[in-house]
Amino acid sequence: YADWMQHHDFTMNHDVMQHHILPMLKQGERVFLVVFDNFRYDQWKAIETELTDYDITEQLCCSILPTATQYARNALFAGMMPSEIKQRYPDWWTEEDAEESKNLNEPHLIQAFLDRVRRRDTFSYHKINATDEAEQLLAEADELLQRNSLNVVVVNFIDMLSHARTESKMVRELAHDEAAYRSLTLSWFRHSAIS
């Protein structure tokens, strides 16, 4: 795995900011980076047809291991591997067995990335856990685009659904197999504020 990581020629979590977001910022584009936490490729394919009004270029990204949020999402925003984050920013790293949230420093990691690549772009960071938060964000979207070069949005519903699938008998019944899980994802997306 270590050798494979050293010589990969495809995009991984920690490459996204450098290879995809940074070039857009350098071209003066205003960027909304929307991250669906715990979102699988088959779920993406299920909702993709709902987005035909948009010009979408699909570029696959391979996740680092482990894929747990604290590693994968922090790597995405920092533009570096978790071991590098822990070494460079020990105050922002939370050990796996710690009780507190492992993603409290995502805005700091985004700012640190921008500082490392010598960008003075303004950015905003939003974590969406409920419909009213999504509606509020949408109401402010035009203003955010005017004010910031980069707007980062983390949508947590899929992650909450995934956890509920293992913890709740009712959700297990609704998403009893992979096809049902994709269907539930699609239904949520169609009726969500972000669709």
Each model region followed by its residue ranges:
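Feature captures the catalytic ectodomains and active-site-proximal regions of enzymes
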Residues: 1-195
